[in-house]
Amino acid sequence: MAKEASGNVYFDVYANEESLGRIVMKLEDDIVPKTAKNFRTLCERPKGEGYKGSTFHRIIPGFMVQGGDYTAHNGTGGRSIYGEKFPDENFELKHTKEGILSMANCGAHTNGSQFFITLGKTQWLDEKHVVFGEVVEGMDVVHKIAKYGSESGQVKKGYRIEIRDCGVLGSN
């Protein structure tokens, strides 16, 4: 397990053809190993099979940015490495600040590939969404992404906020 669980992951994010920068995230392998492995693996897969080329499809300024639907690209799809969905691992970690990385779902035990990054403390999501990491570099990029959102969550017309590249940074 220790061999797999190494290195932070990154997203290189673009708004159409403009680079917004890189987000680097630390995953909590010791606390939520199955959830962290799912996310890390989807960061390593080629375009069409994971996060590379997928978008942030739901962006609510002051709340969160959501992505990870690499199958339908609109919030209705996505798939975990374990099959369609997998159970909530635990709720040990909490939504205590901006930059928290957590699983998006549509109810208990419906984790797939969709995730969100918080833009502030969102404690009402505790016990409902599995926290599995946090942003360690590039929170400014997350705030840039937020500028393309709306209260309804829709991305500003004419913009595609894409994870152009992603992967795992060197082993620790």
From Swiss-Prot:
Its main location: cytoplasm. Residues 10-168 form the PPIase cyclophilin-type domain. Transmembrane segments: none annotated. PPIases accelerate the folding of proteins. They catalyze the cis-trans isomerization of proline imidic peptide bonds in oligopeptides. Belongs to the cyclophilin-type PPIase family. It is an enzyme of class 5 (isomerase). Pfam families: Pro_isomerase (PF00160). GO terms for molecular function: cyclosporin A binding; peptidyl-prolyl cis-trans isomerase activity. PANTHER family: PEPTIDYL-PROLYL CIS-TRANS ISOMERASE, PEPTIDYL-PROLYL CIS-TRANS ISOMERASE D-RELATED. Keywords: Cytoplasm, Isomerase, Rotamase. It catalyses: [protein]-peptidylproline (omega=180) = [protein]-peptidylproline (omega=0). One of its GO terms (biological process) is protein folding. This is Peptidyl-prolyl cis-trans isomerase. Its EC number is 5.2.1.8. It is found in: Cytoplasm. One of its GO terms (cellular component) is cytoplasm.
